[in-house]
Structures are given as structure tokens and as C-alpha cells.
Design a protein with these regions (language model features):
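Helicase P-loop NTPase motor core of nucleic-acid translocases
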Residues: 1-33, 37-49, 55, 158, ...
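Conserved helicase NTPase motor core
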Residues: 8-19, 23-28, 38, 58-59, ...
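ATP-hydrolysis module of ASCE/P-loop NTPase motor domains
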Residues: 21, 88-90, 109-197, 221, ...
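Helicase P-loop NTPase motor core
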Residues: 27, 31-39, 43, 54, ...
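Conserved beta-strand -> loop -> alpha-helix junction used to position metal-binding or nucleic-acid-contacting
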Residues: 83-103, 121, 372-395
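Accessory DNA-binding and partner-docking regions appended to nucleic-acid-acting proteins
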Residues: 521-634
Length: 634
């Protein structure tokens, strides 16, 4: 690696962060400022300068996707190699959970101890802990509160008082949750099992309690890098502190304006206290935004009013942000549909996304777009599965694949990721001899995957959109009760809602459209305070005009297009009806991809339908589906 080449394409602020002294450093990196680039270039530059030993580097982030992206970038910079089976001289890059699990594995191997089993089905374990008092569908709410308590290092005995102080308002009484929490911890102890956050607690305790283990761990890891540090919770921070001991070689990157996970235990105060913890660290900023036009960034800054933001757009001036007021949620859907249809006409490069505060808002929009034949990028299976397969491709040896699959099955609560892990295990069993690596496994996985819709309108919650960017973003539900959400009660929660709106706005690179409905569910609404007294960068419109162009006369759709839309709508109605009867999600009955194939092929026999759905599903749903396909061809 040539150190000068690493700095060649960085701006002055980025270069200052990459080349600062190897002591405690905190970088405030705004949206679109190139923070991951700075972090990876910092690691590469330190190694190139000889001030960091790659085998002693520990880089921690919050998702396996982010860790995989960091590895990819470091490999492109020449730091990691894809053709090396021996990774002992490579940086360690992972999530808090994966690093904790790796340390516990090493500890168990060194002491010939048994590594505790990780709970596979937490809901079932909670039900068993409560016996006749099990909570049924409310178990999810209880487990969410237990996760919050773990993240904040709150014991069952202190839960009720701490949750009350934090003004937590779960669907179940706090005293009931405290009882359930106590029972859950007791049954875990009785059965010798742990859950994910226990891994971090156990690793932290092992370092703090065992001098020999602490010395070995701190000998191994000497240079610390943390991404997205604004999302740290107290438990994760205690783990980081145990890992580093009294070392000052720590490089922290975060954006306080993107701290949006307080509901699950993250505490922005952790990031705010870092200067005091590290003792006179170097504090730097990355103020340049290379993503958003000046107009988009001006509105995002307005949304974050009350917060002093040192950010500036490095983009050329763009089009005004558009604020559209409509009568109700049905007109809101119509505005989104018209915008999406325009986008279909020009293609999906650049990208287009609809963002909402809650998933519930997105469901009718998705149905409307699908019924009108507008492609919708699969929100369920494709993203997590694709990311997991990309991670598999990074594995260099059979051992790497085995460890990756075990980690996912231990760590992940996502069904698609766990399916990929099980498929990797099946692949390894079927390839018991010969050389096996991640690339061959990834080829196998992709070949066995039905291709989901990859191009189309993306529908995401504000939380789900974090870390993403799109050319055109439409934000729906710009009303009080959604922005900010009605569940926000404390000043801290309201501040987080403001940051969440800021995150949503800064997903847009070129075009931002904000839609407000005057009525929702038959009730009058109040405009979101975030979009009151809008700056000059905003153009107000009514529902009669779409944001990018006014309606114009076009030729009527071809009869075949109309027939396809009608069949798609009726198949969706069939799917929804069966799903309601079976108390399940519509996609569990028929996937969007299967409906698209039925619309395209128009099967008229059970045998033809079976080639799409398989014989079992075809036999179960055949009568209802074939009735619709017959009607569409008559």
C-alpha cells in the first residue's frame, strides 16, 4: 500500500481524520460525509505507516452487512487478501456479538469448558418460564423490554423502577414484565442457556474477572476502531472498555444526528460522554455532505431545528424539495402511485424509495403499486438473503464457512439469514471431499434461489432506510402522530423522533417529496411540526399536481396490460382472503414472485400451476387460482 495514494482522493477534513496521531480520536461524521471510507482508509493508512499491526486491529460495527462492506473496502485497499487461508495476520472485523462469541469460544477452548448453548426459540422459552401465565401474542413485547433492559444493564429487580423512570410504555404493565423478566432469567440459568446479549455480558465479565484472559485479549487487540458509535448501548460500551483496558489507541466514528435506536436500548449519551471517558481526545468533524443537494440538506437541517449542525452540501444546486398536501391517505397513495409510474417510464436508474414511520403505512401502498403493475423491490427475502450470500462469498476455507454458519445460527433472529446458514451446512455435508470455499458455496446458494424482484420501488420504514441512499425519496405521513410518532412522550424520545426525520430526509440524493394527508382514517390531522415554516428550498403543491410533472394526456393502456393488472388485483384479493382465514401473512400463502409468474403464464390446468407453485401448494390453492386465470382468458 502506498500511503500517499491512500490520501489522494480525500478532502481536507477526511485527510485530517485519516492521518491524525494514533491516540484517542472521535470523529463526528455527518450523513453522506464518507465515514466508512475514512474509517477504512484510517486502518489502511495506519498499517501502511507501520503504526498498526494488522493482526492487532479490531474493528467493530453493528451489523454483519456493515462488517462485510468494511472487509470488502479494506481488501480493495490491499489490507486483506481473498486468497489467504491463514487469517492470523489479518484485521479482526465484526459485530459486538460476533467478537464476544469468538472470545468466549477461545476461552472455552483454553479452559476445556463447555460453551453455553444459545436460545433458539426465545418465545417458547419465555412461555415455558411463565407456565400457565404465558402471554401468547404479547410475548414479543415482553422480550423487547427484556432486550432493552439487557442493553441498559438493568436487572430484573431494577427493571420496574428504571423503565418507569425512562417512561417506557409497553403494552403490558411494568410489574408484569418484571415478573416475566425474572422468570426468563431463572429458566435460562436452570437450563444453562444464554441469549445474544448474554454473550456480551459473559465476555465482558470474563475479561474483567480473569487477569490471564484480560491480558491475552488485550495482547491480541491493541488498535480499536468503532463505526456507528452513536448507536452504542451501555452494555456494548462496557464491553469496549473491557477490551481496550487503559489503551488510548481508539478511533471512534459516529453521527449524533443519526442516533435513532433508543427504543431498543441504545443511548446517545454514551457517545456524548466519550470525551470525558477518553480524557482530552482529538475531536474532528466531517462536515461535507456528498450525497444530498443543497435543497435536500437545507430541509433536513430545518427538520433538525434546535440542533446546531455543521454540515454543508458539496453537490451542485438541484430542484426544490416538494411538499404535497392531499385530502386523505387514499390521495396520498395516488400521489405515490403516479410518481412511481413516472419512475417506471424512465427506468430504475436512478433509484426511488417510499419511506414511512411505520410498516403499517407501507402495506396499502405496496398493494396499490402491485395491483397497478408497478414493480416493487422485494422487502422480505431479498435484502437479508443477498447480504448473507455475499458474506458467504467472503469465506476462504471450509473452516470459515463452518464458523460463519454457526455464528449466524447463534446470533441471527432473521429467518432468511438462518435459512442461508442451514443451506451452507447442507452444502458442506454434500461436499465432504475436495476443496471448498465461499465462492463455490455462494454459486450454489444463488443457483438454488428463486430470483426475487430486484428492481422497483423500494418501500422502507425510516429505521429500515438508515444507511441507504436513493435518487428520489418520497416521505409519507407528514403529520403529528406519525412525525413525531404518538408513542414519543419524553424529551429524549421527541429528540429521537426529530433525528429519525432527519435520517429519512438525508436518504434522498437528488429529489425529496414530502406528503401530508389532511385526514387519516377519517380524522382530521395536524401537519408535522418538522415541516412548518418551510425554507425557500421547498415548493408547496396540492394533490392535483405530481411533484416532478403535471398530469398530461397519455394514450390509454393496452388491453393486455389492463387484463394483467386486473388478474394481479384478483389474485391479490384471493391471497389476502386466504391469509385472513388462516391468520397469517399474505406472502406466506403466495409470494409476489409467484403471483407475477401466474399473471405471466396464465396456467389453466393444475399441472401447469404445479410447475410454478409445486404440487402441494397447487393442490391446496388450485381451485381458487384457476378460477381467476380462467376468467381472465374468457
Amino acid at each position: 500500500m502506498n500511503p500517499d495514494a491512500l490520501l489522494a482522493e480525500l478532502d481536507d477534513d477526511q485527510r485530517r481524520a485519516v492521518t491524525c496521531a494514533p491516540s484517542a480520536t472521535i470523529v463526528h461524521a455527518g450523513a453522506g460525509s464518507g465515514k466508512t471510507r475514512v474509517l477504512t482508509h484510517r486502518i489502511a493508512w495506519r498499517i501502511a505507516q507501520g503504526t498498526a499491526d494488522p493482526s492487532r486491529v479490531l474493528a467493530i460495527t453493528f451489523t454483519r452487512e456493515a462488517a462485510s462492506e468494511m472487509r470488502r473496502r479494506l481488501r480493495s485497499l490491499g489490507v486483506t487478501r481473498h486468497d489467504r487461508a491463514d487469517d492470523t495476520d489479518q484485521p479482526t472485523i465484526g459485530t459486538f456479538h460476533s467478537v464476544a462469541l469468538a472470545l468466549l469460544r477461545r476461552r472455552a477452548a483454553d479452559t476445556s469448558a463447555q460453551l453455553p448453548s444459545v436460545v433458539g426459540n426465545r418465545t417458547s422459552l419465555l412461555d415455558q418460564a411463565l407456565g400457565e401465565n404465558k402471554l401468547g401474542r404479547r410475548s414479543g413485547a415482553v422480550l423487547a423490554e427484556i432486550d432493552w433492559a439487557h442493553a441498559r444493564m438493568v436487572s430484573p429487580e431494577r427493571y420496574e423502577a428504571e423503565a418507569s423512570r425512562a417512561q417506557r410504555k409497553p403494552a403490558i404493565a411494568l410489574e408484569q414484565i418484571a415478573v416475566a423478566y425474572r422468570a426468563y432469567e431463572k429458566i435460562k440459568q436452570q437450563r444453562g442457556v444464554v441469549d445474544l446479549d448474554d454473550l456480551i455480558s459473559l465476555a465482558t465479565r470474563a475479561i474483567n474477572d480473569r487477569v490471564d484472559f484480560a491480558a491475552a485479549t488485550r495482547f491480541r487487540f491493541r488498535h480499536f476502531f468503532v463505526d456507528e458509535a452513536q448507536d452504542m448501548n451501555p452494555l456494548q460500551f462496557s464491553f469496549l472498555e473491557a477490551l481496550r483496558g487503559n489503551r488510548s489507541d481508539v478511533f471512534i466514528v459516529g453521527d449524533p444526528m443519526q442516533a435513532i435506536y433508543g427504543w431498543n436500548g441504545a443511548d446517545p449519551a454514551v457517545f456524548a460522554r466519550l470525551p470525558d471517558v477518553f480524557g482530552q481526545p482529538t475531536v474532528l468533524a466531517l462536515p461535507n455532505n456528498y450525497r444530498c443537494t443543497p435543497q435536500v440538506l437545507e430541509v433536513a437541517t430545518h427538520v433538525a431545528s434546535g440542533t446546531t449542525l455543521n454540515v454543508r452540501s458539496r453537490r451542485a444546486s438541484g430542484v426544490p424539495v416538494e411538499y404535497v398536501e392531499v385530502d386523505d391517505e387514499y390521495e396520498e397513495i395516488d400521489v405515490v402511485r403516479r410518481l412511481a409510474e413516472q419512475h417506471v417510464r424512465i427506468g430504475f436508474d436512478p433509484s426511488f424509495a417510499v419511506l414511512a414511520r411505520t410498516n403499517v403505512q407501507l402495506e396499502p401502498i405496496e398493494r396499490s403499486l402491485t395491483n397497478c403493475g408497478v414493480p416493487v423491490a422485494s422487502r422480505r427475502a431479498s435484502a437479508m438473503r443477498t447480504n448473507a450470500i455475499d458474506e458467504v462469498a467472503e469465506c476462504r476455507t471450509r473452516h470459515d464457512l463452518t464458523v460463519w454458519a454457526a455464528d449466524v445460527i447463534v446470533e441471527s433472529t432473521d429467518g432468511d439469514e438462518r435459512i442461508v446458514a442451514e443451506q451452507v451446512r447442507a452444502f458442506l455435508r454434500s461436499s465432504s471431499t475436495g476443496v471448498v470455499d465461499g465462492r463455490s458455496a455462494a454459486v450454489f446458494l444463488r443457483a438454488s434461489t428463486a430470483s426475487p424482484e430486484q428492481y422497483g420501488v423500494e418501500l422502507l420504514t425510516f429505521h429500515g432506510a438508515k444507511g441507504r441512499e436513493f435518487s428520489h425519496v418520497v416521505i409519507v405521513g407528514a403529520e403529528r402522530g406519525l412525525m413525531p410518532h404518538s408513542s414519543a412522550a419524553t424529551p429524549e424520545q421527541l429528540d429521537e423522533e426529530s433525528r429519525l426525520a432527519y435520517v429519512a430526509c438525508t436518504r434522498a440524493a437528488d429529489h425529496l417529496t414530502v406528503v401530508r394527508a389532511r385526514r387519516r382514517k377519517g380524522r382530521l390531522t395536524t401537519a408535522s411540526p418538522y415541516f412548518v415554516s418551510l425554507p425557500d428550498a421547498v415548493e408547496r403543491r396540492g394533490a392535483t399536481a405530481t411533484p416532478t410533472e403535471r398530469p398530461r394526456r397519455t394514450a390509454p393502456p393496452h388491453p393486455l396490460v389492463l387484463a394483467e393488472r386486473d388478474l394481479r388485483r384478483r389474485l391479490n384479493d384471493v391471497r389476502d382472503g386466504i391469509a385472513r382465514t388462516n391468520f397469517t401473512m399474505p406472502e406466506a400463502i403466495l409470494s409476489d414472485e409467484e403471483i407475477s409468474r401466474i399473471v405471466k403464464d396464465r396456467p389453466r390446468t393444475l399441472e401447469a400451476l404445479a410447475t410454478i407453485l409445486g404440487p402441494l401448494t397447487a393442490n391446496r390453492l388450485g381451485a381458487a387460482i384457476l378460477r381467476e386465470t380462467h376468467e381472465s382468458t374468457e
